[in-house]
Swiss-Prot record:
Gene that produces this protein: PECAM1
Domain Ig-like C2-type stretches: 35-121, 145-233, 236-315, 328-401, 424-493, 499-591
Protein name from the UniProt record: Platelet endothelial cell adhesion molecule
Purpose: Cell adhesion molecule which is required for leukocyte transendothelial migration (TEM) under most inflammatory conditions. Tyr-690 plays a critical role in TEM and is required for efficient trafficking of PECAM1 to and from the lateral border recycling compartment (LBRC) and is also essential for the LBRC membrane to be targeted around migrating leukocytes. Trans-homophilic interaction may play a role in endothelial cell-cell adhesion via cell junctions. Heterophilic interaction with CD177 plays a role in transendothelial migration of neutrophils.
BP GO terms, sorted: angiogenesis; bicellular tight junction assembly; cell recognition; cell surface receptor signaling pathway; cell-cell adhesion; cell-cell adhesion via plasma-membrane adhesion molecules; cellular response to mechanical stimulus; detection of mechanical stimulus
Residues carrying a glycan: N52, N84, N151, N301, N320, N344, N356, N453, N551
Record-linked Gene3D superfamilies: Immunoglobulins (2.60.40.10)
Consequence of changing F188E: Reduced homophilic cell adhesion
PANTHER family named in the record: IMMUNOGLOBULIN FC RECEPTOR, PLATELET ENDOTHELIAL CELL ADHESION MOLECULE
GO CC terms in record: cell-cell contact zone; cell-cell junction; cytosol; external side of plasma membrane; extracellular exosome; extracellular space; membrane raft; nucleolus
Biased composition (Basic and acidic residues): 699-715
Compositionally biased tracts (Polar residues): 686-698
Cytoplasmic side: 621-738
Cystine pairs: C57-C109, C152-C206, C256-C304, C347-C386, C431-C476, C523-C572
Amino acid sequence: MQPRWAQGATMWLGVLLTLLLCSSLEGQENSFTINSVDMKSLPDWTVQNGKNLTLQCFADVSTTSHVKPQHQMLFYKDDVLFYNISSMKSTESYFIPEVRIYDSGTYKCTVIVNNKEKTTAEYQVLVEGVPSPRVTLDKKEAIQGGIVRVNCSVPEEKAPIHFTIEKLELNEKMVKLKREKNSRDQNFVILEFPVEEQDRVLSFRCQARIISGIHMQTSESTKSELVTVTESFSTPKFHISPTGMIMEGAQLHIKCTIQVTHLAQEFPEIIIQKDKAIVAHNRHGNKAVYSVMAMVEHSGNYTCKVESSRISKVSSIVVNITELFSKPELESSFTHLDQGERLNLSCSIPGAPPANFTIQKEDTIVSQTQDFTKIASKSDSGTYICTAGIDKVVKKSNTVQIVVCEMLSQPRISYDAQFEVIKGQTIEVRCESISGTLPISYQLLKTSKVLENSTKNSNDPAVFKDNPTEDVEYQCVADNCHSHAKMLSEVLRVKVIAPVDEVQISILSSKVVESGEDIVLQCAVNEGSGPITYKFYREKEGKPFYQMTSNATQAFWTKQKASKEQEGEYYCTAFNRANHASSVPRSKILTVRVILAPWKKGLIAVVIIGVIIALLIIAAKCYFLRKAKAKQMPVEMSRPAVPLLNSNNEKMSDPNMEANSHYGHNDDVRNHAMKPINDNKEPLNSDVQYTEVQVSSAESHKDLGKKDTETVYSEVRKAVPDAVESRYSRTEGSLDGT
C-alpha cells in the first residue's frame, strides 16, 4: 500500500498534465499577425567615434490569445546576422559600446512569429571621426646614413587602414620625405626613413584614413618625439705637399682626411678624383693619398669624395704645376710617301733648351737625336713619337703617322670558269693585286663602263657579281695611296650561252603545195647560241623524220617533187646545251596541203573529153549506119507470102483491126501477130525501125470483107547474123490484088 504523500503527488501530476494539454490545444487554435516592425538607433544613426550606440527593434504583433506570443528578433549588419534573441517583448535592444568606424554599415531587423516573418527597412549607421594615431620611434638619436623606424597605429580601429607618415626638420614647415602605405591586415605600419647628411633634428608626423562604405574618414595628424642627428664622419679636408709653387719634377702629395664618429659601424670610402678620373681611394681608413712626380698635366681641379651607403660628402681644391720646359714637337716633311722616297723627321722644343731626344716608332727606338732621315720602305709605315728629357722630367711629343705606300702590282682578273656561263646566270668576277699597300680600291669595268666599286683592307680579292646576257668584256682597275696612275688588268672575255628561245616553223612557199614541186620547211629560233640541234616532226609521230645541228639560228628541210604523202601537220624543236632536257622549246603546228598541178588537171580533162567525143562519134556512126541499112531494105508484103508466115508458125489477125506489135510481148488473140521462128532463141537486141511499104495481096482472105486502102508498117529488127527478119504489114486497097 502506497503512502499518502505519494498518492497526492500522483494526483497533482495528473492535474498538471491536463492543464498543459489544454494549454497546448488552446495554442493551436490561436491566430497571430505581425502588424509592423521598426528599428531605431540611439542616440542617432550618425554617431561620433568612441560614443555608445544602442540599436532597438520594435515588433507590433496581434493575437487572439490573451497571452503574448513568443517571437524571434534577428539583427543584421550588411546582410550578416550578428545578434539573435527569442522574446515575448515587443522591443529588444543591442548595445555597442564605444562605436568605431568598422561599426558603420547597413542595419536591419527581422521578426519571426510562428513561421511568419517581417523585416524592417535598411538603415545606414555612420560613425564619424577617426581616433588620432599613435607614433613611436625605435631611437631618439641617429647618425647620418642611419635609419629611423617609425611605428604608426590606430589600436581602436580594424584594418584596412591607410597610413601617411612624413619626415620633418625641426622648425621647418617643408616636408623632407613622405611615405604612404595601406595596411590590409593590421591596424599599424612600420616604415623606415633614412637619415641624410643635411638632417639635424627630426620629427615624424602620422595620419590615418579609413574607408567606410563610400565615405573616407581621416584622422588628425600626430607628431612623434624629436630625433637628434649626429655626423658619422666629417667633411673631407685636403693637404697638398709641397706648399707654395710646385715645379715640374718635384714630388707631389695630395692627401684627403676625415674624422669618423664612434657611432659609425664601418669606415666610409675616400676617393680622390682629378676631373672625372679616380687617382686614389681607400676603404679602410680615414685618409687617402695621391703621390706623383709633378708634371704640368697634373695641374687641375681635384675632388675628394667620402661615401657611405647613404651619405656622400665632397670637397675640392685646385693644384697648379709650373712648367719646366714645353712639350716637344715632332714634325715630318710628308706623312704619305711612295716607296723609295726620303723620310725626314725632326723633333724640337720651343725655346731650344738643351735636352736629351729620342725618336721612336711604336716601341722601337729609331734615333737618339733630334732628326731622323732614311729612304722609305713599306716597313717604315707606322706611328712615330719623340721624347725629350731634362733632369728627371721627360715629356713626349705629339704622334706622327707615317704611311709609306708600296706600288700596286697589275691586278689579276678571273671568274669561275668551271662551267659555261648561261644567259642571266650570276657569275663572280675576282680582282686581286698581289702586292701593294692597303687599302686597295677596286673598280670593275664592263664594256669600259664602271659596274661596281669595292675597297679592301685585306689581301683578299674583291669579288663582283654580275648577270651577263651576252658576250661581254670585263676589266679591273686597282688603286691605292701610291702616286702612280691606276693599274689596269687584262681584258677578261666571257662567252655567254643564250638558251634557245621562241621556236617557229614555217614553209617558204604557200602552205598549199602543188604536187611535183619542192617542200621547204624552215625551223627558226629568236635567240640561241650555237651549236643548235633542230628536229623536224610530223604530228602524232614520236621520232623526228629529220634532224641537224647548226650554228645558225635557222635550219631547213627540203622534199623534192612533193606528193600527196607529204601532206599533213608538222612541227619542230630546237635546243642547245643551255636548255634543260625537260623543257625543250617547240614550235606551233604547221599544216601543209599538196594538190595536183594545173597542167595535170588539164591533161586529165582533155583525156576525158577525148574519150567522150570518141564515144559520141562511134554512137553517131552506128546510128547512121543502121538508118541507112534500114532504108535499103524495102519489103513488099503480099498474100502469097502468108503461107511463108504461116510456115513460121505465125498467125495473122483480123485485117480490119490495127495492131502494134512490140518485141517480146503478145497482144490479144484478135490481133495479127508474128512470132520468131524459134521461140527458144534470145530476144533480139536491135533497135526497132518502122518502114512504110506498099503491099499488094495476091489473094483475098476469106475473113476480110473490107476493100479499102490501108498503110502497112513494117517493123524491122536488127538481128544477129543470119537471123530472120519478121515483117508486119497491112495492105491498102482491095484484097484480091486489084
